[in-house]
């Protein structure tokens, strides 16, 4: 049989669109059969387009040439270009009427084995222009002159398959010439493409007859070798007397698909609104193998190797093309881009990618009109399926977050520091990804409101050397009953311990303190006789682990050995972290992760001065100084060492001076990408000045300037995949560090005044937090609080 090219040619001007010529697919088992062009539709008046925008920067792919090119923008090719793909090094076979070898659009990129495959021995050329026009859609050069193709750097294997003379001499009984293509020549072109390393073969031809044995065998051989075939669906959609069913691809396309081992893609045409072109055949029974692409109003006819423009009635026109002939090369160009960008992809994988990434059109899912949908190069280039760090089995969830930092890390999540690594998707494609991009900062700690809100009742008592203090509030009835507090029966059923402490002397030199929901640091300070102050926002450095936590149980024991006190303490509880967003965040939802703390300290009084020095060890099971990172970074917890000191000096006139310092070293445990070799250095400090009986008897005025715990240097040491070799499948790893030191530095200044009153006390606090939460340039937090409390 012979087949014919599938295209239509139009002229388009600034305000008028009209049909100029039309050539439809024809053919059969005998000679070439060409349809008679229908009458041209009447002119359609459209609004003149606005003037073009100013030229974009040279680094932009959206150039004036790009805007003239029909396909790259519509199909999202810029994503591929930004990834460095242009088709370079990929051979695209084009079986058609030949190519203009002198055109600047293909200079230096026409394969040496291009030529006549009919046996006629003709030189490389193109009597009709159809092959050149199709090839421009695939691979016209990006040179800022006219238009450029989808894969503008691809190598072109131009295979001239038109029957000699058919494009220039009209067949008997016909008014004009129409190119004819015999199966034997098409088969020869397919075989030559296979032999010369083509990754994809474009066949913008069609006909009413099925392929012969030689062609079916050639298609089978090519696709068995992993070469993709893209063939036009046909242009019988609006013919009055179609040669074959317009609701299905042409019999020629169906025959190729039947022999194609799943690697034949059939191309239907859509317009630039994504609607099926009225001339296009539909996907029909081969909807699972059909992809729609732009094939309507494709720019432009050339003359003298440039866009042909002509004037008519005072207006300038260009000629554009319609046809599934121009849908197919859009897809072939996309194949070339994928093949260059991801050389390890097989033909089957590329076909599957293009079909499954198509943007839906028509009825939801695959349908009988658009097939799998409209070609979407951007989506085809996006990672697909499960993504993992290259060279590992560690899953990296795209669109997920890299974790949530803690208070001591402040604004580090907003620092935009890159943490690049290579991931592989389910197709084995390598991508460079910034693992730090999804890092979230925890909400700054709320200090004033929790300090003021009292939801329970404070109770304390002392008997000899034993002291008991706790607060109670509403809770569930599963907690222990508290009848000894003389609560009503209703209160007993609802009461739970919010926090409590029992302190007692074991001997003259030894005293212990047992706490429930109380930090061990506070019990240590009480046993040592160190003042803590009545501050709401400025924290004593020794009390500050930096992150939000909920102590569970704690215990401290102090023994006096001569002039020195030795104190040991333990604490277990939960680090709390705001990891959620939206409504869950509004509901104050927090994640909880266990920690344990062990400490030992020394204290001594020297005249009017008191000194304390301590060392503590913090173990976190899943967090790092209160932060929790994604699984691909590591979630094996951390261990920290803190050294802290406190000094208080009683001055003359009831004045006193105090200072605290804490220095920390945190080591993230190895796991996933963490090497365990990084160290975070952190510190906190506070300076106190106070005066008793300043304004009233036994009142106390105190000033504190403090910095909450803050990471000062260091971060996470990571071993990350940094390069991937497609040729060998080998991954190269490199050492990287994610700094966790914030730019901001919170300094909290607070004045507290406490006045005892009969049956209670009155207090007021004035505070000023600069860069609260260690967030650089965050608005200052200013406030004042008043409290009046009575015991009943």
Task: Identify the role of each PLM range.
Residues 26-38, 86-87, 161-261, 305, ...:
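Substrate-binding/access-modulating region of protease and related hydrolase catalytic domains
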Residues 64-72, 76, 191, 200-202, ...:
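C-terminal subdomain of the subtilisin-like protease fold in secreted/lumenal serine endopeptidases
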Residues 49-58, 78-92, 97-113, 120-182, ...:
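Subtilisin-like serine protease catalytic core
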Residues 531-544, 567, 581-592, 599, ...:
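Outer membrane beta-barrel transmembrane domains
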Residues 96, 253-336, 340:
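Extracellular S/T/G-rich loop segment that most often corresponds to the catalytic His/Ser-adjacent loop
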Residues 426-428, 433-463, 497-510, 559-563, ...:
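Outer-membrane beta-barrel proteins
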Residues 21-24:
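C-terminal motif of bacterial Sec signal peptides marking the signal peptidase cleavage site
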Residues 442-648:
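Outer membrane beta-barrel translocator domains of Type V secretion systems
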């Amino acid at each position: 049989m012979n087949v014919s090219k599938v295209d239509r040619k139009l002229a388009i001007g600034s305000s008028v669109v009209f049909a100029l010529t039309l050539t439809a697919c024809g053919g059969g088992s005998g000679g070439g059969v060409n349809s008679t062009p229908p009458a041209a539709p009447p002119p359609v008046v459209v609004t003149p387009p606005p003037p073009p925008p100013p030229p974009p920067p040279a680094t932009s792919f959206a150039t004036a040439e790009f805007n003239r090119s029909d396909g790259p923008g519509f199909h999202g090719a810029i994503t591929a270009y930004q990834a460095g793909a242009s088709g370079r090094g990929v051979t695209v076979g084009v079986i058609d009427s030949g190519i203009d070898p002198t055109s600047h659009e293909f200079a230096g990129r026409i394969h040496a084995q291009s030529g006549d495959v009919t046996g006629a021995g003709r030189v490389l050329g193109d009597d009709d222009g159809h092959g050149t026009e199709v090839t421009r859609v695939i691979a016209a050069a990006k040179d800022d002159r006219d238009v450029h193709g989808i894969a503008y750097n691809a190598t072109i294997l131009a295979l001239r398959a038109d029957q000699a003379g058919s494009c220039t001499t009209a067949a008997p009984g016909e008014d004009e010439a129409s190119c004819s293509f015999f199966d034997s020549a098409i088969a020869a072109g397919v075989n030559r493409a296979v032999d010369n390393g083509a990754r994809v073969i474009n066949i913008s031809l069609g006909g009413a007859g099925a392929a012969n044995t030689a062609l079916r065998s050639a298609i089978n051989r090519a696709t068995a070798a992993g070469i993709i075939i893209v063939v036009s669906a046909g242009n019988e959609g609006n013919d009055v007397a179609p040669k074959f069913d317009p609701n299905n691809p042409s019999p020629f396309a169906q025959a190729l698909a039947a022999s194609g081992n799943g690697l034949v893609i059939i191309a239907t045409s859509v317009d630039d609104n994504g609607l099926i072109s009225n001339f296009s055949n539909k996907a029909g029974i081969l909807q699972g193998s059909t992809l729609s692409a732009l094939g309507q109003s494709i720019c432009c006819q050339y003359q003298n190797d440039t866009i042909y423009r002509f004037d008519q009635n005072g207006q300038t026109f260009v000629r554009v093309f319609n046809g599934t002939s121009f849908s197919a090369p859009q897809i072939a160009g996309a194949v070339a881009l994928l093949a260059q960008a991801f050389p390890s992809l097989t033909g089957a994988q590329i076909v599957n990618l293009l079909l499954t990434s198509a943007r839906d059109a028509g009825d939801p899912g695959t349908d009988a009109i658009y097939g799998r949908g409209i070609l979407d190069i951007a989506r085809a280039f996006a990672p697909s399926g499960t993504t993992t760090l290259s060279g590992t089995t560690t899953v990296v969830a795209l669109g997920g977050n890299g974790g949530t930092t803690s208070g001591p890390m402040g604004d580090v999540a907003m620092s935009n520091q890159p943490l690049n690594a290579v991931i592989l998707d389910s197709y084995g494609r390598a991508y460079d990804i910034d693992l730090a991009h999804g890092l979230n900062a925890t909400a700054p700690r709320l200090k004033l409101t929790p300090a003021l809100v009292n939801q329970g009742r404070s109770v304390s008592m002392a008997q000899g050397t034993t002291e008991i203090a706790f607060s109670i509030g509403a809770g569930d009835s599963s907690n222990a009953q508290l009848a000894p507090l003389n609560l009503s029966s209703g209160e007993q059923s609802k009461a739970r311990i919010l926090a409590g402490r029992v302190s007692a002397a074991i001997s003259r030199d030894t005293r212990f303190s047992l706490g429930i929901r109380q930090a061990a640091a506070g019990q240590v300070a009480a046993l040592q006789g160190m003042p803590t102050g009545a501050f709401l926002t400025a924290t004593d450095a020794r009390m500050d682990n930096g992150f939000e936590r909920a102590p569970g149980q704690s215990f401290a024991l102090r023994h006096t050995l001569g002039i020195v006190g030795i104190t040991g303490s333990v604490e277990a509880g939960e680090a709390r972290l705001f990891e959620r967003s939206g409504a869950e965040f509004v509901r104050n939802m927090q994640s909880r992760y266990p920690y344990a703390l062990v400490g030992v300290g020394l204290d001594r009084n020297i005249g009017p001065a008191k000194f304390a020095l301590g060392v503590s060890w913090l173990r976190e099971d899943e967090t790092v100084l209160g932060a929790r990172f994604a699984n691909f970074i590591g979630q094996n917890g951390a261990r920290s060492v803190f050294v802290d000191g406190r000094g208080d000096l009683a001055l003359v006139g009831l004045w006193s001076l105090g200072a605290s310092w804490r220095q920390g070293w945190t080591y993230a445990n190895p796991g996933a990408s963490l090497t365990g070799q990084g160290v975070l250095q952190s510190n906190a400090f506070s300076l106190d000045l106070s005066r008793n009986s300043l304004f009233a008897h036994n009142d106390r005025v105190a000033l504190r300037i403090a910095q909450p715990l803050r990471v000062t240097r260091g971060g996470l040491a990571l071993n990350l995949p940094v390069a991937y070799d497609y040729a060998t499948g080998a991954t190269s790893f490199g050492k990287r560090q994610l700094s966790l030191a914030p730019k901001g530095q919170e300094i909290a200044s607070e004045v507290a005044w406490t006045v005892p009153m009969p049956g209670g006390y009155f207090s007021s606090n004035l505070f000023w937090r600069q860069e609260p939460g260690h967030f650089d340039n965050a608005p200052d937090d200013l406030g004042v609080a008043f409290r009046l409390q009575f015991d009943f």
